[in-house]
């Protein structure tokens, strides 16, 4: 009995050491192999950063990944995952306070370019990675990048977060347009030059001719100059069916993994009407210069 107990403790110690050895120096990323994991076991991982990467080679068993430290915080948070291709050998779920698991990433040819979801206040920010069974032993890698954001815009509709959340294709209401103009990572006035579709990533890339950068929190866009027109790329979901259209638009959205993702895109004239009406009734969330 004593020998069995010692062997069990030794195995647990080796698994913990193996998982620990897979951490990057800043403990923002982890790389490990299922070949060192006991069948049916659940490895425990904690990444203290708000962005990083996971690379799980030859997935086996399961991993439970806690993001951003052990304290869930008092504000809602948003996690976005972007899989590396080919993503194979595992599924990724988000743990919910109810005990349910919400599927975020799964292997297969229809895997979209990424997914975001929201955790509520005090909800533990944990992901559950489960290996999928395969009969052969060919090399499989389940790898993805993650970003964790504090959700300061809980009143925004789901499509404001971009990158594959439910409802991402419906138009924004007038109230959502006004709030997006005040809280988005970027607000630019421009026209659509073209739209390219990526069926593999299930994304559409909108090429925008930038007339004016009204606001941005990151240096994603540059205005046109005397040397030529400034152009920018904004991503959205392929299933939204974006097509080139005439006229000027106000593009608003978020930065995800260093890329611009579309939230709301009303015609500039339409937004001007909504904003003017809000100014008249003193219901505008913020002031902005449209001229």
UniProtKB/Swiss-Prot annotation:
An example of a Gene Ontology cellular component annotation for this protein is: extracellular space
Task: Report disulfide bridges, numbered on this chain.
Answer: 28-49, 80-116, 169-240, 172-264, 182-286
Domain of life the protein comes from: Eukaryota
Principal subcellular localisation of the protein: secreted
Q: Native species of this protein? A: Mus musculus (Mouse)
Annotated coiled-coil positions are none
Q: What does this protein do?
A: Involved in both glial cell differentiation and axonal network formation during neurogenesis. Promotes astrocyte differentiation and transforms cerebellar astrocytes into radial glia. Also induces axonal extension in small and intermediate neurons of sensory ganglia by activating nearby satellite glia.
What does the subunit section of this Swiss-Prot or TrEMBL entry state? Answer: Monomer.
Q: In which tissues is it expressed?
A: Highly expressed in brain. Expressed in undifferentiated neural progenitors and in astrocyte lineage, particularly in Bergmann glia, a subtype of radial glia, and a few discrete neuronal populations residing in the superior colliculus, the ocular motor nucleus, the raphe and pontine nuclei, and in various thalamic nuclei. Weakly expressed in heart, kidney, skeletal muscle, spleen, testis, gut and lung.
For this entry, the protein name equals Meteorin
Q: Read off the InterPro entries from this record.
A: Meteorin-like
Q: What is the lineage of its organism?
A: Eukaryota, Metazoa, Chordata, Craniata, Vertebrata
Q: Which GO terms describe its biological process?
A: axonogenesis; positive regulation of axonogenesis; radial glial cell differentiation
Spell out the note in the miscellaneous section: Was called meteorin because it can transform glial cells into cells with an elongated trail.
Chain's gene name: Metrn
Q: What keywords were assigned to this record?
A: Developmental protein, Differentiation, Disulfide bond, Neurogenesis, Secreted, Signal
Span of the secretion signal? 1-21
Q: What induces it?
A: By all-trans retinoic acid (ATRA).
The UniProt similarity line reads: Belongs to the meteorin family.
What is its subcellular localisation?
Secreted
